[in-house]
Amino acid sequence: MTVVEISTDGTLTKTTLGQDVLQEQKVQHLVKAGTWFGSFPNNGTTYSFVGCTVAPGFDFCDFQLGSRSKLIDEYPQHFKDIEMLTEGLP
């Protein structure tokens, strides 16, 4: 699975999760607060089994589902990634 992040300064980072650390895969990954993120299965796989733990605690007041149009307006340089990760969203 690959995690795609857009930080508050607009930097896009892709992190590949997996067991092969010699191929720079990571077995776990931390996404910082305030970062937009999404993920997709790697080539050759059709799904990923994922868990997401939040700390110190989760409050829906702090949650915001990304809007395709708003994200593209804010980060037009990442149009292709945003479009792929927000399929089916307005």
Residue spans for each PLM region:
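Short linear sequence motif anchored by a di-proline
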Residues: 1-90
